[in-house]
Amino acid sequence: ANPGDVFDSGSAFNDPVYPQFGVQCSRETAIQATHNDGNMSLELVVESVTRENRDGGQVTAIATRDKFYPFYVTIYYKTYPDCEVIETWTEIRHLEKKPVTLYRFASAFLPVRRGDNWLSHFHGPWGAEAYLYEEALRDGMRVIKDKDGVRNTQNSCPSFMLTLDGRPDEQHGMVIGGTLAWSGNYRIAIDNDNAHTTRIFAGINEDQSQYILEPKEVFTTPVFAFTFSDEGKGGVSRNFHRWARLHRLNHGGEQRSILLNSWEGVSMNVNQEVMDQMMADFAAMGGEMFVMDDGWFGDKYPRNNGTSSLGDWVVCKEKLPEGIEGLTASAREKGLKFGIWIEPEMTNSKSELFEKHPEWVIQQPHREMHKGRGGTQLVLDLSNPEVQEFVFGVVDKLMTAHPEIAYIKWDANMTLFNYGSTYLPRDKQSHLYIAYHRGLENILKRIHAKYPGLVMQACASGGGRINYGLLPYYDEFWTSDNTDALQRIFIQWGVSNFFPAVAMASHVSVDTNYQTGRKTPLKLRFDVAMSGRMGMELQPAHMTDEDKAFARRAIADYKLIRPVVQQGDLYRLISPFDKTGYASLMYVSPEKDHAAYFVYKLEQYHNMPRPAFRMAGL
């Protein structure tokens, strides 16, 4: 190869670092563009390679340009030696006289020599998120993708592991793991070609998202993070967990509070008396924070059900005559921190906001609007700077008026239907999927800059936003709306492959579960919740005195193991997906002087001995 060609150096591959559609067109590509003169090809050559230390890692930048057109692509690699993770992304720009259309713009290309390669990936609908699927890779292409538009981790997840030497194992084997740090639509293509190579492409899903790139405009792709371990899938997980806590997750090294959320306890039936009672009961159990969920807002249209009021973020005085200040004062008196629920990206057609600004919702000309939850919910157009200002103002006004708010649960309960924007110009309607999430990120950056100590949870119909694109601004995610203890073992097992316990909200709910109707012992519900960021999701008034006493002891026990669970190294021992009737995992402190060991019995067998469980990490 010529020195200037964009080829990998020092490996057995003769693949470009960033494959382009152009002179050679027969393979999958990372980038495809059409110049304004109609030429659909690119031919990139290297102009320079630079290195610098930046924000805890070393960044290598490979600057390339087209041989003929003033079209430039810079490929970045950022290495983190303290966790053995590499981030990669690209910047695309041009100095042509007229716009260039981008049809493909991957964040990453990763070629892997084919052997006995196995893919581990995670799928599942609402209430059954992140179920593990494993398969041997055969000829052809495997595509993992999402097109929800708002939430991107219900149905599938932008993460995978590739075991290079046979069937996947937790503690043995050579494994590559990858995850896309993006909150919008994504596409991960794993292509087994006839040259005995597995070629991996990861980035934004380009379907209905061709991008008109103006001269001098810079298009930056999301980060794709990847790692390698010869200690099996568990080694990959521990690398990602360290990377998250040290470099990616907001307040990643800080201890999380034990909280009670009001949703499953009282739904939208909030009022001052009930909130005071729940706080008093939880404080007596040793709790640390109370979070008031949906149902507290709406003036003209009080929020009594899911059909109205989103966008009208003012206190419903009928329910809370003392306002939020009455609740924060009550929490303070009881020694609790206070949090609140919002869904600021959404509105209802039955709301004062929609009556005032119908142009702010995502919509199409000459089409009837398809509405979501309650038959009235609509998505606000975050590509519009006025809407971004409004959404930022929701949080800013709450925090300015009530600085004692310590926690915000940020929800998003609708798919992006009615694809169209009254803000974007006619020739850039295809930007909406991307512009929506860039608008969301702009809002979150402003909130983070002004309120750096504020703790926020990413919720989206449960576990719809479990991704590293948002976690620099959120401290945790709601893992699933399904709080059934048995099913949570499976869900949390899947999520733990890429995300640390400190970010994984796991709540104790009632004995007849809200979603499944299953009855489970209180001890099991606490034991499962203790393996993540533990909280509660019930009405304490419905607990017996015996259950309250047990909860006090369990909360005290969790406080003892919280440092090792939230900041320790995870070792998954017996998988619930192996169908042995058991699941087991443990957390080990970095100094290896403390450990928390969990064993769950999933099925009841008569007169069957329990298998031996081998610990790890000590």
Located regions from the model:
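Active-site beta-loop-alpha junctions enriched in small/polar residues
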Residues: 105, 183, 226, 260-265, ...
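Carbohydrate-binding surface patches
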Residues: 160-162, 170, 576-617
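Active-site neighborhood of glycoside hydrolase catalytic domains
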Residues: 316-325, 329-333, 355-523, 527, ...
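Short Pro-Gly-centered flexible turn/kink motifs
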Residues: 30-33, 46, 211-230
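Aromatic-lined carbohydrate-binding/catalytic grooves of carbohydrate-active enzymes
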Residues: 251-393, 402, 406-407, 418-419
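Short acidic, Pro/Gly- and aromatic-enriched capping/linker segments at domain boundaries
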Residues: 194-214, 453
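Polysaccharide-binding surfaces and accessory modules of carbohydrate-active proteins
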Residues: 1-191, 207
